[in-house]
Amino acid sequence: MAETRVRKNESIDAALRRFKRSLSKEGTLAEVRKRKHYEKPSVRRKKKSEAARKRKF
Protein backbone atom coordinates (compact mmCIF):
# COMPACT_ATOMS: atom_id res chain seq x y z
CA MET A 1 0.00 0.00 0.00
CA ALA A 2 1.39 3.37 -1.01
CA GLU A 3 1.72 5.90 1.75
CA THR A 4 2.86 9.48 1.31
CA ARG A 5 3.27 11.97 4.10
CA VAL A 6 3.24 15.67 3.36
CA ARG A 7 6.62 17.17 4.26
CA LYS A 8 7.12 20.53 5.91
CA ASN A 9 6.67 23.41 3.50
CA GLU A 10 5.54 21.03 0.73
CA SER A 11 2.51 21.87 -1.33
CA ILE A 12 -0.35 19.44 -1.63
CA ASP A 13 0.24 19.29 -5.39
CA ALA A 14 3.82 18.10 -4.91
CA ALA A 15 2.72 15.48 -2.37
CA LEU A 16 0.01 14.29 -4.76
CA ARG A 17 2.58 13.99 -7.57
CA ARG A 18 4.83 11.90 -5.29
CA PHE A 19 1.85 9.73 -4.33
CA LYS A 20 0.86 9.14 -7.95
CA ARG A 21 4.46 8.29 -8.84
CA SER A 22 4.64 5.74 -6.03
CA LEU A 23 1.34 4.19 -7.16
CA SER A 24 2.59 3.84 -10.72
CA LYS A 25 5.88 2.29 -9.53
CA GLU A 26 3.98 -0.30 -7.51
CA GLY A 27 1.58 -0.98 -10.36
CA THR A 28 -1.42 -0.48 -8.08
CA LEU A 29 -3.59 1.41 -10.57
CA ALA A 30 -2.91 -1.10 -13.33
CA GLU A 31 -3.86 -3.92 -10.98
CA VAL A 32 -7.11 -2.18 -10.03
CA ARG A 33 -8.02 -1.64 -13.68
CA LYS A 34 -7.22 -5.26 -14.47
CA ARG A 35 -9.37 -6.58 -11.63
CA LYS A 36 -12.29 -4.20 -12.08
CA HIS A 37 -14.27 -6.82 -13.99
CA TYR A 38 -13.82 -10.58 -13.83
CA GLU A 39 -12.12 -12.05 -16.86
CA LYS A 40 -12.38 -15.76 -17.60
CA PRO A 41 -9.05 -17.59 -17.81
CA SER A 42 -9.71 -18.51 -21.44
CA VAL A 43 -10.25 -14.85 -22.35
CA ARG A 44 -7.11 -13.90 -20.42
CA ARG A 45 -5.06 -16.49 -22.35
CA LYS A 46 -6.52 -15.28 -25.65
CA LYS A 47 -5.60 -11.65 -24.90
CA LYS A 48 -2.12 -12.71 -23.84
CA SER A 49 -1.52 -14.65 -27.07
CA GLU A 50 -2.87 -11.77 -29.20
CA ALA A 51 -0.53 -9.34 -27.46
CA ALA A 52 2.41 -11.68 -28.10
CA ARG A 53 1.40 -11.94 -31.75
CA LYS A 54 1.27 -8.13 -32.05
CA ARG A 55 4.72 -7.82 -30.47
CA LYS A 56 6.13 -10.38 -32.90
CA PHE A 57 5.06 -8.46 -36.02
UniProtKB/Swiss-Prot annotation:
Keyword Ribonucleoprotein annotated: yes
One annotated Gene Ontology cellular component of this protein: ribonucleoprotein complex
Phosphoprotein recorded as keyword: no
Coiled coil spans: none
Keywords per UniProt: Ribonucleoprotein, Ribosomal protein
NCBIfam families (UniProt xref): S21p
Name of this chain's protein: Small ribosomal subunit protein bS21
Organism the protein comes from: Halalkalibacterium halodurans (strain ATCC BAA-125 / DSM 18197 / FERM 7344 / JCM 9153 / C-125)
